[in-house]
């Protein structure tokens, strides 16, 4: 693994730890101010014509409130993540990671919120630090 690939793997690990710790502050610290997060309507919606933008462009207060609400109202049952691929630009200032996830949240009434499938996390190096600029919602493969 190259130096940059290792840096990206550490970013994935840091994000995973933030989910595991239910740490909204650390989670949003990983996001670039221009980040967007499109979501497929279903895990089978591979055609981007079926995708949505439920969060809009990154807004620190709004996104932190949303993630904190999840953390406050759901218990994390499992959060399994496996990096499948890391690709780095020739300039070493952009990269993406393909990650298979199996994350299960359950609320106090037993309602499940499951994220299971594959995601793509896109990174840009900004002022010497990696930030997530785009992240796809979960797709089944």
Which residues fall in each region the model found?
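Short, low-complexity N-terminal intrinsically disordered segments enriched in polar/charged residues
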Residues: 1-34, 110
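Short, cysteine-centered beta-strand-loop-beta hairpins and adjacent loop/turn segments enriched
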Residues: 73, 104-113
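A short hydrophobic beta-strand element
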Residues: 77-81, 92-103, 117
């Amino acid at each position: 693994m190259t130096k940059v690939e290792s840096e990206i793997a550490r970013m994935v690990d840091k994000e995973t730890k933030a989910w595991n710790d239910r740490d909204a502050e650390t989670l949003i610290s990983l996001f670039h101010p221009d980040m967007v997060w499109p979501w497929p309507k279903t895990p089978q919606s591979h055609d981007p014509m079926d995708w949505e933008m439920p969060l809009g462009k990154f807004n620190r207060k709004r996104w932190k409130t949303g993630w904190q609400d999840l953390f406050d109202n759901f218990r994390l049952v499992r959060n399994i993540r496996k990096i499948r691929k890391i690709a780095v630009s020739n300039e070493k200032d952009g990269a993406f990671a393909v990650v298979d996830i199996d994350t299960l949240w359950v609320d106090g009434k037993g309602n499940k919120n499951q994220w299971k499938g594959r995601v793509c996390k896109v990174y840009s190096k900004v002022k010497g630090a990696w930030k997530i600029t785009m992240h796809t919602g979960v797709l089944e493969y």
